[in-house]
Amino acid sequence: HFETDGNKLMLNGVWDFRWYETIAEKAADFYRTDFDASGWDTIPVPGMWEMNGYGDPVYVNVGYAWKGHFENNPPYPADWHNYAGQYRRTFVLDDSWKGKDVFLHIGSATSNVRVWVNGKEVGYSEDSKLEARFDITRFVKNGENLIALEIFRWCAGTYLEDQDFWR
């Protein structure tokens, strides 16, 4: 969701979404404002790919989630079984947001997230158990804005995660 000095704009809901079996297949320029995502699927956010029909859900209460997918080789995850998901959504900021600092708050993204706003890269976060917060003030404008997210199933930080939950 968005948060700024007590004002919030929730971005939960249906997002445009494209899932890729490998990171090599992903669209290189999906974050651009002129990119045509009309053929994309949609997905609820917050939500999990695996619980929405993408990839394979894995439940682990002992050991690592990637067991059987790739060998331990910290900090490098295997590229051959590393899914990618790309998300897009527009939102509108009216005059009441003018002059305010605007932050994007992502409660969780497994296992990492890269963020673009209006075609410009904002930042990257790599820890699915912690929230990510990005100052997007200089990237937003009055009126319609585009936010784009890219998430990989595995990343270097994946080696630090081993808990009892669905992945």
Question: What function would you assign to each model-found segment?
Answer:
Residues 52-78:
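Surface-exposed, low-complexity/disordered Ser/Thr/Gly/Pro/Asn-rich loops and linkers
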Residues 11-12, 37, 87-88:
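Hydrophobic residues on conserved beta-strands that form the core of alpha/beta folds
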Residues 1-26:
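N-terminal pre-domain segments of enzymes
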Residues 17-21, 26, 48-51, 55-56, ...:
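Accessory beta-strand-rich segments of carbohydrate-active enzymes
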Residues 34-37, 61-62, 122-124, 166-167:
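Short, low-complexity, polar/charged sequence segments that are solvent-exposed and flexible
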Residues 10, 42-44, 90-92:
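Ser/Thr- (and often Asn-) enriched beta-sheet segments in non-cytosolic proteins
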